């Protein structure tokens, strides 16, 4: 999967400078001399940085809300509410917004669970959340929403490594042994 991301989103697929439209070349850039995309005309360095994803683990009565994805990546697999942080938006605002969009529920963030980072992937920031209102409603990105007790988490059908790691931490924080 990381190889596919590199092919479609990697530095070799960016060909033109966003400032002047000049063609980009690969060049060593100080101070660490890592190879980057550099404009042949204006010398602008185009750093391809990871995107940021904000997610929540909504909790209620000792259970966690999981969403089954109806789109790729991870079609048919389970995760928690989350999505990309929009430009100009804080990570916490994005976490609350994504939860509302994907579940119909409003939440208060109760703390940072953890930050997950994998080469070639977005940085995923996951918060614990308490439901404060709304009506449980799936969206176009998921076809099923379910409250699950720790023993009911479908470890074999989780969508992403970050989903698995975050849920393991959530379960372990309750003094239980995580599955999967």
Predicted regions and their residues:
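A broadly conserved sequence feature marking short terminus-proximal activation segments
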Residues: 1-14, 166-176, 180
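N-terminal cysteine/histidine-rich coordination modules
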Residues: 1-47
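Conserved Nudix-box catalytic region and its N-terminal flanking loop in Nudix hydrolases
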Residues: 4-7, 59-101, 114
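Conserved N-terminal beta-strand and adjoining loop/helix that marks the start
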Residues: 14, 22, 40-65, 84, ...
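A short coil-to-beta-strand element that immediately follows conserved catalytic motifs
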Residues: 27-28, 105-113
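Short beta-strand micro-motifs in enzyme catalytic cores
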Residues: 33-37, 52, 121-127
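Conserved hydrophobic "DFG−1" position in protein kinase catalytic cores
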Residues: 58-59, 66, 129, 147
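Active-site-adjacent beta-strand/loop module that shapes the phosphate/pyrophosphate-binding cleft
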Residues: 115-137, 146, 150, 166, ...
């Amino acid at each position: 999967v990381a190889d596919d991301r590199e092919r479609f989103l990697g530095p070799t697929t960016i060909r033109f400078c966003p400032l002047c439209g000049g063609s980009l070349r690969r060049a060593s850039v100080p101070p660490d001399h890592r190879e980057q995309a550099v404009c042949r005309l204006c010398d602008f360095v185009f750093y391809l940085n990871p995107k940021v994803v904000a997610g929540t683990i909504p909790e209620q009565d000792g259970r966690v809300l999981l969403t089954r994805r109806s789109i790729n990546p991870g079609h048919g697999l389970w995760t928690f509410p989350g999505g990309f942080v929009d430009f100009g938006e804080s990570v916490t605002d994005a976490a609350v917004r994504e939860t509302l969009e994907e579940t119909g529920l409003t939440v208060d963030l109760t703390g940072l669970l953890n930050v997950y980072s994998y080469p070639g992937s977005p940085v995923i920031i996951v918060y614990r959340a308490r439901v404060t209102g709304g009506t449980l409603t799936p969206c176009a990105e998921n076809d099923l929403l379910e409250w699950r007790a720790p023993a009911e988490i479908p470890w074999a059908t989780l969508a992403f490594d970050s989903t698995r790691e975050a849920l393991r931490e959530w379960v372990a924080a309750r003094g239980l042994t995580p599955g999967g």
